[in-house]
């Protein structure tokens, strides 16, 4: 079938993106789902920094490619061998498919699935298949097994989690990345305890999700750190106990003074080495630093090893919040419905697919938390 999609043909075009237009809205071919696959109608798709990283080259992908990895959709066709999802079901797309059989999947760590990572890196679906192509022929890649910046997508069954039908599309989409990654880092990777002192460095959709999760987990201090005053003000409105400007040369001393020597848990969500360095240095002796920000693959962090050893510090990476999506999406939705995780507050604005390039500029400037594309 023919579908409209945002296609990235060249990586690294300069900002402003409203002028360089790295994403072109094109008609592309979408093949029928194969065994173990679904065709879904994309209802809403979030614009995430990982999408920007694909466009500016921080996270290289094969091109041409249809970006988009955070979305909610309706199932419109079911391939053979899919027995537990039916036409009409509502689903959240998950950007790391899991095979269910590799060593990591076998021990309950699907975020580390080897075949899932390999298929993502190659721009295909789980198993190496591609269901997208350019009109007239030519390879077209799937971003993270989702390719959600399109009217429809063909995805692996293992790239979706069914959700309640009454959850609004614009809110449901956020659970696929911002919530899984941010809240998962708190509940799964760090497993913070009630009464802990916490800090979040970097207030995008993932960072705000971490902040909300820390509050929900019963953290005593929830400190927010960013470079934009508007985001710091928003953090206070959402329940942060204190906020600090990351550009202030005294920010390290300020946080340590405010917390009596540092926080128990610091979450780096900015995807930049200076943010990771700050997150590490504001933790106390015996503290834990969790990084989920995904900097450029060439970025190197020079760690003072003796401080990590002598002060018994812990550093943890967190990918997709160390989540088991089939468990954690329903879990976080239940917390949202109970008023403990106000995911709806992440939504900055809704846009149309053909407004995506100017939206990239707002994302790059840090002016939005989550812009969500609503498909016509």
Predicted regions, residues:
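Cysteine-cluster motifs in flexible loop/terminal segments that predominantly coordinate metals
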Residues: 95-152, 156-158
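Local beta-strand N-terminus motif with an aromatic residue
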Residues: 88, 150, 195, 240, ...
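Glycine-rich cofactor phosphate-binding loops and adjacent beta1-alpha1 units
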Residues: 190-196, 227, 233-314
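Mid-domain Rossmann-like dinucleotide-binding core that forms the NAD(H)/NADP(H) cofactor-binding site
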Residues: 151-152, 158-160, 164-249, 253
């Amino acid at each position: 079938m023919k579908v409209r999609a945002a296609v990235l043909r060249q990586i690294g075009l300069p900002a402003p993106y409203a002028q360089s237009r790295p994403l072109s809205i094109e008609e592309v071919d979408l093949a029928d789902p194969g065994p173990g696959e679904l065709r879904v109608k994309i209802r809403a798709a979030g614009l995430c920094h990982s999408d920007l990283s694909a466009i500016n080259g921080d996270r290289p992908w094969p091109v041409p490619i249809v970006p988009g990895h955070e979305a909610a959709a309706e199932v419109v066709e079911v391939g053979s061998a899919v027995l537990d999802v039916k036409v009409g079901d509502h689903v959240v797309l998950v950007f790391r498919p899991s095979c269910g059989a590799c060593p990591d999947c076998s021990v309950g760590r699907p975020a580390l699935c080897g075949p899932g990572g390999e298929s993502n890196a190659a721009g295909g679906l789980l198993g190496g298949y591609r269901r997208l192509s350019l009109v007239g022929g030519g390879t077209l890649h799937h971003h993270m097994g989702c390719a959600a910046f399109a009217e429809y997508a063909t995805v692996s069954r293992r790239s979706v989690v069914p959700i309640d039908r009454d959850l609004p599309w614009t809110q449901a989409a956020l659970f696929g990345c911002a919530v899984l990654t941010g809240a998962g880092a708190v509940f799964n990777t760090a497993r913070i305890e009630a009464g802990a002192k916490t800090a979040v460095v970097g207030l995008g959709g993932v960072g705000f999700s971490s902040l909300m999760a820390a509050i929900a987990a019963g953290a005593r201090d929830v400190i927010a750190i960013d470079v934009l005053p508007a985001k710091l003000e928003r953090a206070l409105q959402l329940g942060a106990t204190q906020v600090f400007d990351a550009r202030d040369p005294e920010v390290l001393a300020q946080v340590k003074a405010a917390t009596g020597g540092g926080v128990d848990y610091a979450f780096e969500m900015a995807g930049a080495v200076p943010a990771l360095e700050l997150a590490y240095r504001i933790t106390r002796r015996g503290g834990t630093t969790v990084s989920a920000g995904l900097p450029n693959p060439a970025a190197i962090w020079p760690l003072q090893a003796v401080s990590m050893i002598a002060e018994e510090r812990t550093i943890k990476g967190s990918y997709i919040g160390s989540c088991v999506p089939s468990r954690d999406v329903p879990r976080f939705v239940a917390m949202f419905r109970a008023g403990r995780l106000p995911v709806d507050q992440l939504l900055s604005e809704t846009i149309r697919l053909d407004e995506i390039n100017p939206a990239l500029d707002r994302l790059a400037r840090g002016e939005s938390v989550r812009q969500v594309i609503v498909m016509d």
